[in-house]
Design a protein with these regions (language model features):
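N-terminal catalytic cores of peptidoglycan-degrading enzymes
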Residues: 1-115
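Basic/polar, cationic surfaces and motifs that engage anionic cell-wall
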Residues: 2-15, 115-120, 129-194
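Conserved, mostly hydrophobic/aromatic
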Residues: 42, 124, 142
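Residues immediately flanking
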Residues: 44-45, 126, 165
Length: 194
């Protein structure tokens, strides 16, 4: 698996939207307490759990999930969550919240001595689970998007890209043990050099 240097993604700093991503607006966001954006948090999600390509994540982030579609949906029907981006297993990228807004992805969290990571982070959901490998195209998209985000928000560095499990230990497990951090970082570095 190799990352190619054909980055189709760039951030429009006038709108804080990702060029190259499909735009679907979530109502689940608010203003950041400051303009600082200095952390990138990697998550995983699948709805129903363990199932892919259902578009239920989109419905969930837009408060349009029908609880009668699956028993698990009844459990989460009142949650209001979002992420800035979703990278599906096919490589499709969807943006739900502009980067200058506070998406609701991290919950109770801390990083580098600071609480409330939603205040200063960008959240990226990978369609997947803790127990299945992610796809090559997901790693490619994640590396390309991370590169674009670091160029646009220079306080995000490679050392400030982390997993949800790292900022909410004991509460969250994603992106999970099968997320290959070494592969991501090595290919991210080749993307930067290439």
């Amino acid at each position: 698996m190799a990352i190619t240097n054909d980055n189709i993604f760039s951030v429009d700093l006038s709108t804080h939207r990702l060029n190259g991503a499909e735009q679907i607006d979530s109502p689940n966001f608010n203003e950041r307490p400051s303009q600082e954006i200095s952390l990138l948090v990697i998550h995983n999600i699948s709805l129903p759990p363990g199932e892919f390509d259902s578009r239920c994540v989109e419905q969930f982030f837009c408060n349009q999930l029908d609880p009668s579609q699956h028993p698990y949906f009844e459990e989460i029907k009142d949650l209001e969550v979002s992420s800035h981006l979703l990278i599906e297993r096919t490589g499709r990228v969807v943006q739900f919240v502009p980067f200058d807004k506070r998406a609701w992805h991290a919950g109770a969290s801390y990083f580098d001595g600071r609480e409330n990571c939603n205040d200063f982070s960008i959240g990226i959901e990978l369609e997947g689970t803790d127990c299945q490998p992610f796809t090559e195209i997901q790693y490619q998209r994640l590396a390309s998007i991370s590169q674009s985000l670091m160029l646009s928000y220079p306080e995000i560095t490679l050392n400030r890209i982390t997993g949800h499990s790292d900022i909410a230990p004991g509460r969250k497990t994603d992106p999970g043990p099968l997320f290959d951090w070494g592969f991501f970082r090595s290919n991210f570095e080749s993307e930067r050099v290439g």
